Amino acid sequence: METLANIHPGEILSEEFLKPMNISAYKLSKDIGIPQTRTSAILKGVRAITADTALRLSLYFGTSAKFWLGLQDDFDLEEVFKNKQVELSKIKKKEDYAA
């Protein structure tokens, strides 16, 4: 069974928001008051969406900040699981005990 690629929030920002609305990275940066380098890094998938950026995107697009942070959290968790699967598989569940 083929696994799906882990999608960075920057790809969702680009494909689901910027392209359909014909908004450039420069315009987004200017409109929400962040450096264009930050926007470009997010769109390239090399920078995470922070709480600050999530709030700005939510106000601009009429979404919630939790939407953007949730996308980032999902991406981060999948990356850690993928990169540390062997190490994480060694962790055993703590058995319940009476105190």
Regions found by a protein language model. Name each.
Residues 33, 44, 73:
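Residue-level detection of the helix-turn-helix DNA-binding "recognition helix"
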Residues 18, 29, 58:
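The alpha-helix within a helix-turn-helix
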Residues 69-99:
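Short, charged recognition helix plus adjacent turn
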Residues 22-41:
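Short alpha-helical DNA-recognition segment
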Residues 46-59:
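Short, basic-rich loop-to-helix N-cap that marks the start of a DNA-contacting helix
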Residues 1-23, 70:
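A short, Lys/Arg-rich alpha-helix, primarily the initiator
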